[in-house]
Amino acid sequence: MRVRLAKEDVNSNYKVSLIDVSREKDFVKILEDYNIKYKRTEYFKDLFMYKLIDINSKFIMILQEKASNYIKYIEPVSIYSLPLQIEDEDGEIPVVYPEENKDYVTLGVIDNGIAHIKHLDPWIKRVHTRFLREETSTTHGTFVSGIALYGDKLENREIVKNEPFYLLDATVLSATTIEEDDLLKNIALAIEENHKRVKIWNLSLSVRLGIEEDTFSDFGVVLDHLQKTYGVLIFKSAGNGGNFMKQLPKGKL
């Protein structure tokens, strides 16, 4: 049983993976005996997680005593986030419009929404969201979509040399942060409902935890499963750290 505790051992939400699923009822009984609130999320067959709400090392010690032989690991739930601030720069570039009777690929933007500004509105083909518009800020998704469509023009040089494309706004979070289980369910729903028309997806959310040296994360496993199940490609950002602003060496992925 691998254990990783939250910083300063404050009460936090933890995720638990079982190595022996036949003991699931025993595990649930322990949770209920100690009045622990929990949420079970099944991503696909044979991959599910338990999220234990608001616990600390005291209850984790109980799990080590009573269930260490069938728990694979317990660790804080990963929290994915967006930049809190995006710098504005003055300038203007011409609006690009779709040509009539021309087919364009559609890019799925998995983010916090895309604002219907004049540069992007002609290209937004569809909006997939579980949130009310007033609940979303559309800051980061708009930023990402603008770079995707106008990147070469903003740089005033050819870097990507790509053709324009339609956008599918896949809004998967309403605030600036979201816990891993909720995020993955939202991503899965967006791809499940739109995979026939959208084969390329961009995912530029961040997580503050470093990668493991010898194992794949649950997040990566679920994304791979979605790619194989629905025949899509998901492009995930990595290494977007801030060390360069402090003139420090590159950090670990």
Regions found by a protein language model. Name each.
Residues 110-117, 145-163, 189-194:
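Flexible, small-residue-rich helix->loop connector segments that border functional cores
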Residues 10-13, 100-107, 163-165:
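A short, charged/proline- and glycine-enriched loop
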Residues 148, 154-176, 199-204:
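Short helix-loop-beta-strand segments that form the rim/entrance of peptidase-like active sites
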Residues 92-132, 147:
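Acidic-leg catalytic submotif of subtilisin-like serine proteases
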Residues 131-143:
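Gly/Ser-rich catalytic serine loop of serine hydrolases
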